[in-house]
């Protein structure tokens, strides 16, 4: 399996619960390396641009409002099969449907406040990483 990079966001609900370290430990425990990371407060414009793919969806405004409701922890994860591995660690979008032991089952409150975001494909990962970490801010380890 190839070494990949994926974007991961610990959302405002999980940041507010003070579980950033526990979530990062799960990534590292699964063999993923953190190649870049930053704590940020997204502006409305940043959130709207990042989630533009969902602009026509009925949940778009709620998603943007949620993502700007508090700080987020944004990281680039690197490792073999990083995209799928991260998605497996996160669990189903709806925490009620997420398998026990996944990040969303353990830390998310609802389908809206679902603790984490992860890229869904190599193409999306490249775009999302460039959005939050332009230039030389990502390092192989």
Curated annotation (Swiss-Prot):
It is found in: Cytoplasm. It catalyses: a 2'-deoxyribonucleoside 5'-diphosphate + ATP = a 2'-deoxyribonucleoside 5'-triphosphate + ADP; a ribonucleoside 5'-diphosphate + ATP = a ribonucleoside 5'-triphosphate + ADP. It comes from Leptothrix cholodnii (strain ATCC 51168 / LMG 8142 / SP-6). The keyword Phosphoprotein applies. Homotetramer. GO terms for molecular function: ATP binding; metal ion binding; nucleoside diphosphate kinase activity. This is Nucleoside diphosphate kinase. InterPro entries: NDK-like_dom (IPR034907), NDK-like_dom_sf (IPR036850), Nucleoside_diP_kinase (IPR001564), Nucleoside_diP_kinase_AS (IPR023005). Keywords: ATP-binding, Cytoplasm, Kinase, Magnesium, Metal-binding, Nucleotide metabolism, Nucleotide-binding, Phosphoprotein, Transferase. Its cofactor is Mg(2+).
